[in-house]
C-alpha cells in the first residue's frame, strides 16, 4: 500500500462514538497505561504537555491524575471527540484539568516554542498533512522539548505479538486477530515512517520500536 493510500484512509476510521467506546475498553486502557508510564516518568515538574489528536481524552485524563503538577492541553479535529473529553475535565480540580480545544494538527493554534512535550498516539496515520504536521509538532516544542508520535508497526512479528500479549496479560489469539484487522490500514512500515520523518525533521527525528508492536518517533525542536 502506498503512502497516498494510507493517508487517504480516513473512511476506514471508526466514527467518533465507536472510537470513544473502543478507547474505554480494556485493551486501550492497558495501552494507555504503557504510554502513561513513558510520559509520566520522563517529564520534569510543571512541564507543559500537548496531546495532538487526543480523541475522547483518556490519555491526558490519566496523566492529570498521576501528574497533577503538569500543564495539559489536548486537541482534536473532531468537535464530537472534544465534546466527549470535556466532561472528564469538569470532574477535576481546575488547576489540574486538561484544556481541550478543536484544532487541526496541520496548523496548531499555538506560538512557537511553548511545549516541553508533544504526544500524538495512533492518529498520525490519518493526518492529511503528515510532513507539515510533524513540522508543526517541532515548531511548538520548547528548547530541550521532545515530540513523541506513536503508531502501529506494520512489521511487528509473531514473537513481537507474543511479547505484547504476555506483557499486557492478553490472549495471543485476541492480539493476533486484532493486529491483522488493523495493521493493513492503520499501521506504518519503517520505510514509510522514516521517509516522512526525514522530510520533516532531517537529523532531528528518530524512529524506534516501542512496546513490541508500536513505533515511537521522536522529534527535537527545529
What is the meaning of each model-derived region?
Residues 117-129:
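A short SAM/SAH-binding and catalytic strip from SAM-dependent methyltransferases
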Residues 216-222:
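C-terminal lobe and adjacent flexible extensions of AdoMet/dcAdoMet transferase-like proteins
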